[in-house]
């Protein structure tokens, strides 16, 4: 789906592991005919960074992890999200800045304000128009 004014809408799903965000993001993207993407891993570079970050043998420091996530987000915004929006396409993204604030900020003990600032700089302040936060209890997520 595209907008007649030439600008797409940017929608992000956030939530803990097992909250259903990937399922709901997929459903919404299909319903809207939108571009579906995720972070990390929405681009070729992002896929490589995702593999590195998920590799339990990789000895990545907390700050390095935050910087790699910001690098993924910068590439993702420039290569995929902005061009799609400019073409009038809606973009639905599974995770975005909120996940970095949660995982690298609160989870890794980095200053959440620093993580937010880094993400804003990496994306040149590209913000979603809507963030859907899915919250479920641990029993539901398990």
Q: Where are these predicted regions, by residue range?
A:
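Hydrophobic anchor at the beta1->P-loop junction of P-loop NTPases
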Residues: 13
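Conserved phosphoryl-transfer catalytic core
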Residues: 30-34
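Hydrophobic positions on the alpha1 helix immediately C-terminal to the Walker A/P-loop
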Residues: 24, 28
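Conserved lysine of the Walker
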Residues: 21
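ATP-dependent small-molecule kinase phosphotransfer cores
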Residues: 35-123
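Phosphate-binding P-loop
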Residues: 2-8
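Conserved phosphate-donor/acceptor-positioning beta-strand/loop module used by diverse small-molecule
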Residues: 93-95, 124-142
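Walker A (P-loop) phosphate-binding loop of P-loop NTPases
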Residues: 18
């Amino acid at each position: 789906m595209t907008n007649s004014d030439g600008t797409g809408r940017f929608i992000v799903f956030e939530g803990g592991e097992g909250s259903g965000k990937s399922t709901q993001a997929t459903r919404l993207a299909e319903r809207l005919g939108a571009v579906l993407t995720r972070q990390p891993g929405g681009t070729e570079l992002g896929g490589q960074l995702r593999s590195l970050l998920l590799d339990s043998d990789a000895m990545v420091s907390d700050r390095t992890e935050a910087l790699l996530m910001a690098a993924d987000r910068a590439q993702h915004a420039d290569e995929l999200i902005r061009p799609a929006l400019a073409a009038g396409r809606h973009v639905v993204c599974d995770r975005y800045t909120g996940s970095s604030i949660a995982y690298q900020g609160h989870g890794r003990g980095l200053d959440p304000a620093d993580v937010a600032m880094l993400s804003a700089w990496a994306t040149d302040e590209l913000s979603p128009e809507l963030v859907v936060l899915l919250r479920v209890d641990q029993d539901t997520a398990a």
